[in-house]
């Protein structure tokens, strides 16, 4: 089992006095949830691990109800400290305002609940953190797996790493490229575009954004002029539109 360096960061920050919310942010399918599972095996403090994936988005009370349950548990069990973990928190409408309210309540009343947030949508996390939680969080970036990690875990060659990338979930399919492409499209690309971009940003030309993504993949690692891209796109509009869409894709 690969132990990523970010695990030590999580452990260290959870051992410190309560000060900031810890936010694990990174691309899909790079092991954020696995890191939390590894952390839980080492943690001696009472924890509550929640996932908002199946919660109805407009159920804003869900976060507050779960949070209050932790407070009640701490009081009944005589706990001086508790770690609350919420995965896919960005799927709850107005999540950041609710988290701010509950976090500030605990701060005012000296309730020692430490908080870890995870999310697969960088756009939604970014919007929520900048809107309501400025000054209250620290970001722990979870990047793609490095070549060293992929080599150790899956015996990747450098050529395989350059071609297939640092996605551990897809690594078992590299000997069947058709299946690998299907997995990448269904598990990573489509959710990133459909859920993280089209559902959170006002995109007037979604077909153009998809074309731009495909061209970006074809020219990965190359420098290419906007004018050249326009010539390969249908209904491309102007270069400022392309620049905005590229920025959105980069943030997703």
PLM segments and residue spans:
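Conserved catalytic/switch belt of AAA+ P-loop NTPases
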Residues: 96-117
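Hydrophobic anchor at the beta1->P-loop junction of P-loop NTPases
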Residues: 24
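Interdomain hinge/linker elements that couple catalytic modules in large macromolecular machines
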Residues: 144-252
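Conserved lysine of the Walker
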Residues: 32
């Amino acid at each position: 089992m690969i132990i990523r360096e970010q695990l030590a960061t999580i452990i260290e920050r959870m051992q410190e006095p309560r000060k900031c919310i810890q936010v694990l942010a990174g691309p899909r399918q790079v092991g954020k949830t696995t890191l939390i599972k590894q952390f839980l095996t080492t943690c001696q403090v009472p924890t509550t691990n929640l996932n908002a994936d199946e919660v109805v988005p407009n159920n804003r009370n869900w976060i507050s109800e779960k949070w209050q349950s932790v407070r009640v548990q701490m009081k009944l069990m005589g706990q001086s400290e508790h770690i609350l973990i919420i995965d896919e928190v960005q799927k709850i409408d107005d999540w950041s305002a609710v988290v701010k309210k509950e976090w500030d309540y605990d701060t005012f009343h000296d309730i020692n609940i430490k908080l870890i947030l995870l999310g697969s949508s960088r756009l939604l996390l970014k919007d929520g953190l900048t809107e309501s939680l400025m000054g209250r969080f620290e970001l722990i970036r979870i990047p793609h797996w490095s070549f060293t990690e992929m080599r150790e875990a899956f015996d990747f060659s450098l050529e395989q790493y350059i071609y297939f990338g640092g996605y551990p979930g897809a690594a078992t399919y590299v000997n069947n490229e058709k299946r690998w492409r299907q997995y990448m499209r269904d598990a990573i690309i489509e959710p990133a575009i459909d859920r993280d971009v089209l559902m959170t940003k006002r995109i007037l030309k979604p077909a153009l954004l998809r074309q731009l993504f495909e061209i970006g993949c074809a020219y990965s690692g190359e420098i290419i002029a906007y004018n050249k891209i326009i010539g390969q796109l249908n209904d491309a509009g102007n270069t400022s539109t392309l620049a905005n869409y590229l920025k959105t894709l980069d943030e997703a």
